[in-house]
């Protein structure tokens, strides 16, 4: 699968600074903020800049910066505040001597803060040189879906006794071009057809323009040759929503005939708009995303001390494939979890003298979690050599553990979503039980991400990834939604950022599908609680 290039949202950043260090002698500094983003091995690249504000040490900038937001990426941003005495044309032309200070953080860190606002120190030469205040706002698209049902009344009979009608809806471009946005099914032998409900994103329906002209054509379907036009009509989304629901269908070829009125009526009913909530709205309302990690400790991984072993701590590569997977996925998700604790389990190894398919990786039943990604990696590196490897490779127990934890937070006002990261080297041996657990889990606020390390074919893993259809367990129960994403580590081992992108790209959609399925909207946005911003002490 190719990593998604479609952003989850577009966000707008606004800036203020407070109590900047003055670099000018006669007057005050002329601050301007330059934004750069870390992009791959090439390091930071310039994105955009604010305007320059003259003679002001606590400026509020008018120009906003718009960025695409990707949940699955760590979008590291650096905000550099410069004292600009002369106009520059290139980012590289900046004089380092004119730097007031800079601040580096991730876009996710800003977006997950209460009020989507952060106030931080500007640092230069290890000294605080002022404060920067960054506010983020999602650029609102329509975020709505349109629903409508259509009915034909008294349509012309194009066949011997009846017609086989269907309809098309086109939106009209400013240049007059008609773009097809919807085509209904064919209703056989019926001049008073009732078509199934139309449901689609408002942007796709009318481009977000409620007054854009819509052309509607009704045809009689013919299995051989061209379909026969019954009639056309024109309207707008606004008119339909205001209750103009019956439209005469006109056939241009018949308008010159004496006594011609129309070729039937097209009627719309049950027309409504429904707001589509965004991933960022759930974040703003305090929805937490917690990470649970399960590490494969089966014998097929090889010896921890062998260079060919998958748990071998290869320092030249940044650790084992397991450690790199944890660092890649965990570093993205950790920004969205307020308490910072990550549950860590092992499976397929010996625990307390017998093979266990779900045991605390700390080896202490009273300590199921570690703090932050660094804590998980420390626990992993400390204990992996202490665990006797065994087998087989069973997933059901760790999924059941995740189900139990996801079931703890199902109150609407305590919105929490769990991501279970399973890192494994082999094929599943309890496929039926695993599918049964995943079908059960599809009703819960839970996603399962599987990273396959090593050289196995992972055929069963691809079956679990519901991209090719819903999972069905051995009892015939169908998964309510797709919650599994499988990624082979070797495909992205040379690019850890790409691994995180591919691994996590479906999480926002899966979270939204869960809360939509239970009819729960985002909580109201949390309020940013301001703190007194005091000038730095005299140096």
Curated annotation (Swiss-Prot):
Q: Where does Ca(2+) 1 bind?
A: 24, 30, 83, 85
> Which Gene3D superfamilies is this protein grouped with?
C2 domain
Quote any Pfam family the record assigns.
Copine
Biological processes, Gene Ontology terms: cell-cell adhesion; cell-substrate adhesion; cellular response to calcium ion; negative regulation of gene expression; positive regulation of gene expression; sorocarp development
Source species, domain of life: Eukaryota
One term of GO molecular function: metal ion binding
Return the protein name: Copine-C
The species this protein was found in: Dictyostelium discoideum
Q: Which gene encodes it?
A: cpnC
């Amino acid at each position: 699968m190719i990593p998604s290039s479609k952003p989850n949202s577009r966000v707008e950043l606004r800036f203020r600074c407070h109590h900047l260090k003055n670099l000018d002698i006669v007057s005050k500094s002329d601050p301007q903020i330059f934004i750069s983003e870390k992009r791959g091995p090439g390091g930071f690249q310039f994105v955009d800049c604010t305007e320059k504000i003259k003679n002001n040490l606590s400026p509020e900038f008018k120009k906003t910066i718009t960025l695409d937001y990707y949940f699955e990426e760590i979008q590291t941003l650096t905000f550099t505040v410069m004292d600009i005495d002369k106009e520059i044309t290139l980012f590289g032309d900046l004089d380092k001597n004119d730097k007031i200070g800079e601040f580096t953080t991730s876009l996710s860190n800003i977006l997950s803060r209460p009020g989507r606002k952060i106030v931080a120190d500007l640092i230069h030469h290890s000294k605080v040189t002022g404060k920067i205040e960054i506010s983020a706002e999602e650029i609102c698209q329509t975020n709505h879906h349109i629903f409508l049902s259509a009915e034909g009344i008294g349509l012309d009979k194009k066949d011997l006794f009846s017609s086989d009608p269907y309809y098309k809806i086109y939106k009209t471009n400013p240049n007059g071009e008609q773009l097809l946005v919807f085509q209904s099914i064919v209703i056989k032998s019926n001049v008073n057809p009732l078509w199934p409900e139309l449901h689609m994103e408002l942007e796709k329906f009318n481009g977000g323009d409620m007054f854009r002209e819509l052309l509607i054509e009704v045809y009689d379907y013919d299995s051989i040759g061209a379909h026969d036009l019954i009639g056309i009509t024109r309207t707008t989304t606004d008119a339909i929503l205001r209750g103009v629901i019956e439209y005469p269908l006109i056939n241009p070829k018949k308008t010159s005939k004496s006594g011609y009125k129309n070729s039937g009526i097209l009627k719309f009913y049950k027309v409504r708009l429904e707001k589509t909530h965004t991933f960022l709205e759930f974040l703003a309302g305090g929805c937490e995303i917690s990470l649970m990690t399960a590490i494969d400790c089966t014998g097929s991984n090889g010896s921890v001390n062998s260079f060919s072993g998958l748990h071998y701590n290869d320092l030249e590569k940044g650790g084992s494939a397991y450690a790199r997977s944890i660092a890649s996925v965990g570093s993205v998700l950790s920004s969205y979890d307020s308490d910072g604790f990550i549950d860590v389990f092992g499976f397929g190894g010996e625990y307390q003298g017998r093979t266990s398919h779900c045991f605390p990786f700390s080896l202490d039943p009273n300590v199921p979690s570690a703090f932050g990604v660094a804590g998980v990696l420390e626990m992993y590196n400390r204990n992996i050599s202490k665990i006797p490897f065994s087998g087989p490779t069973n997933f059901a127990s760790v999924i059941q553990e995740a189900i139990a934890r996801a079931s703890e937070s199902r109150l609407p006002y305590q919105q929490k979503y769990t991501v279970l990261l399973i890192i494994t080297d082999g094929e599943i041996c309890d496929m039926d039980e695993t599918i049964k657990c995943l079908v059960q889990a599809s009703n819960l606020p839970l996603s399962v991400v599987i990273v396959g390390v090593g050289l196995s074919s992972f055929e069963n893993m691809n079956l679990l990834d519901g991209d090719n259809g819903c999972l069905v367990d051995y009892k015939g129960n169908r998964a309510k939604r797709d919650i599994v994403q499988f990624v082979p580590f070797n495909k992205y081992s040379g690019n850890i950022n790409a691994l995180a992108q591919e691994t996590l790209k479906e999480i926002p959609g899966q979270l939204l599908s869960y809360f939509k399925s239970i009819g729960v909207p985002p909580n109201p946005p949390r309020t940013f609680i301001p703190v007194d911003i005091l000038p730095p002490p005299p140096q």
